[in-house]
Every structure is written in C-alpha cells, then in structure tokens.
Amino acid sequence: MAFWNLGTLKLEQFRPGIMSKAQIGGNLIMVCMQIDQGKEDTGHEHPFDQCGIVLEGNIEMFVDQERRILNANECYFIPAGQRHGWKTF
C-alpha cells in the first residue's frame, strides 16, 4: 500500500493495549500505532530503518544510549540494527 489515510486506516491489535498497522519495505518500516498509557517495550532491533511522528500525547523513547521524551509533532529516526524501545505515560 503506497498511501495511508490516518482517518480511515484500519489498525489491528499488536499486543494488549497496542493497535498498529505496519508496512515493511526492503530497508524501511512505516508503522502507525495507538498505544495505551502505561505500556512499555524494553527494547528490540530489526534489520531496517524506522522513522515516525508522534501525533498526540507523549512517549519516552531510547535509541541505543540516547533517551528522550517526545511530544506531539516531534519525529524520530532509528537506524537499522539499533536497539530501541519506548514507554508511554
């Protein structure tokens, strides 16, 4: 799928409290996620780049040793192979 409309995009349950839709290409993953407060991913990595935008709320993310709280309208980029994770509050 080349184009997404976030207003009509159908999300599926990824884990309890996390709804998502992912599109994986050869070198990049694009993901739309709705994450309940109090959820956490303690860290993982994958063989493709990932980037995203926080649309609302806030999330604490780490990429390798860098940690930051992101708010609405802030973006992130995760290079392939970098350990990363997040938590919502």
Would you name each region that the model predicts?
Residues 1-27:
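A short, N-terminal "cap"/entry segment at the start of jelly-roll beta-barrel domains
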Residues 16, 31-46:
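Conserved short histidine dyad/triad with adjacent acidic residue
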Residues 34-36, 46-61:
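Short, conserved beta-strand element in jelly-roll/cupin
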Residues 42, 51, 66-68:
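Short, surface-exposed secondary-structure edge patches
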Residues 58-60, 67, 83:
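Structural motif
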Residues 66-80:
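Short acidic-glycine-tyrosine-enriched beta hairpin
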Residues 80-89:
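Ligand-binding loop in jelly-roll beta-barrel domains
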